[in-house]
Amino acid sequence: MSYFGEHFWGDKNHGFEVLYHCVKQGPVATKELADFIRERANIEETYSKAMAKLSKLASNGTPMGTFAPLWEVFRVSSDKLALCHLELTRKLHDLLKDVLRYGEEQLKTHKKCKEEVLGTVDAVQMLSGVGQLLPKSRENYLSRCMDLERLRRENTSQKEMDKAETKSKKAADSLRRSVDKYNSARADFEIKMLDSALRFQAMEEAHLQHMKALLGSYAHSVEDTHVQIGQVHEEFKQNVENVTVDMLLRKFAESKGTGREKPGPLDFDAYSSAALQEAMKRLRGAKAFRLPGLSRREPRASVDFLESDSGVPPEVDDEGFTVRPDISQNNGAEPPRFSSSDSDFDDEEPRKFYVHIKPAPTRAVACSSEAAAAQLRATAGSLILPPGPGGTMKRHSSRDTSGKPQRPRSAPRTGSCAEKPLASEEPLSKSLFGPPLESAFDHDDFTGSSSLGFTSSPSPFSSSSPENVEDSGLDSPSHAAPGPSPESWVPRPGTPQSPPTCRAQHPEPRGLMPRAPSPGPWGPEGGADSLTPADPTREGLAATLRRPRSRKVSCPLTRSNGDLCRSLSPSPLGSSAPTIPPDRPSFSTQMGHGISRGPSPVVLGSQDALPVATAFTEYVHAYFRGHSPSCLARVTGELTMTFPAGIVRVFSGTPPPPVLSFRLVNTAPVEHFQPNADLIFSDPSQSDPETKDFWLNMAALTEALQHQAEQNPTASYYNLVLLRYQFSRPGPESVPLQMSAHWQCGPTLTRVSVEYSYRAGATAVSTPLTNVQILLPVGEPVTSVRLQPAATWNTEEKRFTWKLPDVCEAGGSGHLSASWQPQSGPSTPSPVAAQFTSEGATLSGLDLELLGGGYRMSLVKRRFATGMYLVSC
């Protein structure tokens, strides 16, 4: 209904001005709404900081007493409330950006509308001008008519009458022209005014709809936050109820108890006889009382020692004193180890110290790596760490309590280690302090998540060209954390894993059976047919927001370890899991001698951001049939995030670390996301299909990293699988390698031809396919085999394997053929399998952006490989 077209007319024609000023108030309302949302975001941020401060206050509660475990309940609840309000702050800031963006667009729209309604402004001005002239013309006409009538009554001359009639006719004509001009201006004004009114109403309708949508987003964000807050309070109430009084008393008794054995009764006779015997022993061992050091004529204990040990009688001077032998003349004898403490005049004599360092006993010349590593650990364990920044270290005295000099200790060294520097010092330093953070993705186990107990399928990737990126500086902390023992910083030799090599397996039906994904702590976001559902008894947001402390409540606050030790295949497909694992050869490193402090530890606030790295790993499953260009394809992938080892201490210290949040872009092709419910949260209310925001549960992240650090304290980085995803790829252009196969099975001759071609459109960035292998199974005895080009034969698995060079866009096609004579009748066609890997791109095109501050992205790795890649005739 056109409200503006019906209610803004009137005699004075002020309707257009009212409508125009109403439209101009739109940007003002948008600006005021932005100010309101900004102020609400500031309030939520302040409240979040206050809750974080309250959580810190709860964490500093006294660990003594039976009430101590309940402080952990308060801390967890406060952390969750702070996280809820912080998430609302983030949503409000995003909404504020939308409001400001709309305000800019609104200004452009109003500027364009102002140019379009200029005609209406002219029509209003024209009608106003004509309306002002019309009364004047009417007054003039009335005046002329009255003059003519007055002359007629006065019987004026005809000449005067003619003049008056002429003037009256001219006034009538002028009035008629004014009326016609007014009617014309009015008609033009009515048309333009109606058009402008409709235009203004449409603008206001769009403005109000957009503003209502913004208000709906605001209300939805606040409502979601209040629902989460209600869940946190409900969980707090449940946790308090679960921690019973008996549980608190039992926990205090078990942790602070002094023992279960009660003191027994005493027998007076036995107790008194034992005391009497002890007193007699003390009396027999006592010496006569005397004041030492009053006379220099008392012989020294050291002289008595020399007399008893030396076969030469001591030299005596004229007064009867024994002369101390010169140390320089008695090199053959062992220096005295005792001195007299009975004299008060010891400090007046010059005292000489004789230090004799005995060489280490001769050992075998050969020094094994195990002995060298054990020796290095013993040496490093006796070292004292340098003081931290702003700290001081007291220098200990070289004398013991008796005043004698201590003999310096030296670590035993073998002959070969002491003769020359070892050439293996560089591998040792790498094993002690680890490679840079970015080298975490050069190993085959980067897709695993050892902290959560997830085991992924073997990765077919190998590290051929490690990137030269900056060192994170967090790989080798030189200061021990306040919690662990000093052994946590003692370097230990590691045994890094080697990159695997692709080895194909015979794709027999038994080897192509899919592996069902194991249940794990993952929350699906898709259909039940594609992703394994999570445990229905799993606790949601309430059960994962916790931080490990020295005191924990033995109640449902902590999750059972059973969920954390389950394995999950990287391919959640029910029938398309990669079942051709590569070999994993072992790798060992000879350890040498040497030690280095490594880079200085990073303290939160000493750098702009903490480094993290991510990796996208995808597996493509495809099935081709004969020479048909169509295929069935599905891609599964996972996102892995890597943290340097030193960041564990930063996360465990104070102040608490900022929340790590990130955004996945180009998510429209992905059908299902399966996030790790124990580590990350997502906003289900996001409407943009191209992006998806996630943020990490910092308490659970810290616990997972600490668990990995306990399991592997020498690791320089830790990997965590954050989420998995899958999507379908229809059409032949959706896979990187198009394949076709043709079998000709005769009674005396079998011919097989395989064709392949590279598809550059499967990925956004064309990357070569490496480690390409084509596997042709032959499950029968054959003779007269001819292969073009040459292939290798695996007797155990009964298959031919073509190892092809890298397949890229230039010349990325080829033809393979094989023929043989079957010995047991016509051959049975079997599927031909392919294997390959690719670095530098993904099939999904997903990308990751960090949100907020406190972290920086050190490296983003992208790679994909084959899962089940088959072609049948």
UniProtKB/Swiss-Prot annotation:
* Coiled-coil region(s): 155-178
Tell me the Gene3D superfamilies matching this sequence: Arfaptin homology (AH) domain/BAR domain, Mu homology domain, subdomain B
Its tissue distribution reads: Mainly detected in brain and spleen.
Q: Name one GO cellular component term.
A: cytosol
This protein's record includes keyword Phosphoprotein: yes
Task: Supply one GO molecular-function term.
Answer: AP-2 adaptor complex binding
Kindly state which keywords UniProt assigns to this record, in alphabetical order.
Coated pit, Coiled coil, Endocytosis, Membrane, Phosphoprotein
Where does the F-BAR domain lie?
A: 1-248
**Principal place where this protein is found?**
membrane
Mediates interaction with the adaptor protein complex AP-2, as annotated region: 267-439
Cite the residue spans of the region called Mediates interaction with AGFG1, CALM, DAB2, EPS15, EPS15R, ITSN1 and clathrin. Answer: 593-873
Function recorded in the entry? Functions in an early step of clathrin-mediated endocytosis. Has both a membrane binding/bending activity and the ability to recruit proteins essential to the formation of functional clathrin-coated pits. May regulate Bmp signaling by regulating clathrin-mediated endocytosis of Bmp receptors. Involved in the regulation of T-cell poliferation and activation. Affects TCR clustering upon receptor triggering and modulates its internalisation, playing a role in TCR-dependent T-cell activation.
From the Swiss-Prot or TrEMBL record, give the protein name.
F-BAR domain only protein 1
**Gene name for this UniProt entry:** Fcho1
